[in-house]
Structures are given as C-alpha cells and as structure tokens.
Amino acid sequence: KIDVTNFSKLGKSIEKNKPDVLIHLAGQTSHSKSFDNPIHDIDVNAKSTLFMLQKIKELNLKCKFVLGSTFIVIGKPEKLPVNEQSFCNPTTIYGANRLLSEHYCKIFNQVYGLDTLIFRITNSFGPREQVIKNKNAVNYLIHQAFKGNKINIYNNGNFYRDLIYISDVITGIKTIIKKGKKGNLYWISSGKKTWFHQLGSWLTQFSDVKIRYVNSPIYTQKVDVGNFVVDNSKLKSLGW
C-alpha cells in the first residue's frame, strides 16, 4: 500500500513495476471533507494524477493510464440526460479537483501522446463499499436500513439519481480498458432514473427501517447536483 501523496514512494513503485495498465482509483471522495481540508484534497485528487502522468512520461513507459472520475464534476446539470459532451461546472472542491485530473489526462494525451482513458461513475452501490454517512448516500441508507436504524431522506424523496451496481461498474471498467479509444471519456451508469422516494419504499419492504422525510440542510442545497441521469450509449457502443 502506498499513500498517493507520498510522491517519492509512488514514483519508485511505478519505476520498479513498469505497469502496462495503471488504473487510478485512489482518492478522497467526500465532498464535505474537501471543504474541511482543501489543500489535502488537491494533493490527493489532482496532484497525484499529475505526478503519475509525468512519471509515465519521464520513464517513457508504454502504459495505459486509466482515471476513475465522478459525476460530481458536472455540478448542477444544464440538461438531462448528461453525456460526454455535457458542460462541467462543479459545485465542490472535490469536484473541481477531479475535473482538473481529467484535464491533466487530456493534456498528456494531446501533447505527449500518452494512452489515457477516463471514466465517470454515477451513484454506485454494492458489497464491501465503505459505509460513511457523508460519502456514499445510497450504500449508507441501505446499510442503516438493514441494521434497523432510522434513516432520513431529503425533500420527500422527490429527486432521482442514476444508480449502478458495483458488478456493472467493474464490467464497464474492463470494457473501457479493452476497447476504449485512447484520449476518450466514458460514462459508466445504468442510464435509468431511480427516485429516492422509490428507494425508500423498497427499503421499507425488505427491512424494518423507519424513514423520516426531512428538508435538506442549507449546505446540501448549495452543492447538491439535484436530479441526475446519464446517456451511457457511448460505453454501450463498445459492446458493454
């Protein structure tokens, strides 16, 4: 294990292993924590990507660099469904730094010819995900429900997201690595709307959970992306 902000160890590992494929999934993924410690967030979510790309260039490695990114880079979408051409206007420091990482990949591809690929994931859920309240709302709600704890859902659940199961995310990543065109961006998503009042209804059917519908906090209102669904036809065109 290596801390991706420890550039000395990270560089030595890349130099020693000379990877054919480097999949960058490491990072700080809580938008609230990105406001608490913004300098750390730029180190782990942006500078780490730049360092890896520069190291691959310096060593002249024939390495496919694959960056995992997030739907948060979009901010509040201007138009739905979102696709690879949608305008990005992130509302959080985390989102801004992830978008910066994407731009580093594009620049190193266009200027130096590095084989870079980017994928963005919508709200994923499934086993072995970290259960952190301010990190992955869907997994947190599911976990709390099956523990029998009360859960809060904002705004009567009258908003929807594009939820995707982790096994589908994995097959999407594999497809992009095998068939993706270098320098390109792909969305990994279900392409379907899931309303949160519907999610709440499912949880009450399969558990003893009690749901409270509450107003969202002021902070959430400022940064939340709102309704979100993706057109994933570009990934499907690869045979996914």
Predicted region positions:
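Active-site helix of classical SDR
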Residues: 93, 97-100
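Conserved sequence/active-site signature of Rossmann-fold short-chain dehydrogenase/reductase
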Residues: 5, 29, 73, 124-126, ...
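NAD(P)-dependent short-chain dehydrogenase/reductase
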Residues: 80, 103-162, 166-175, 202-206
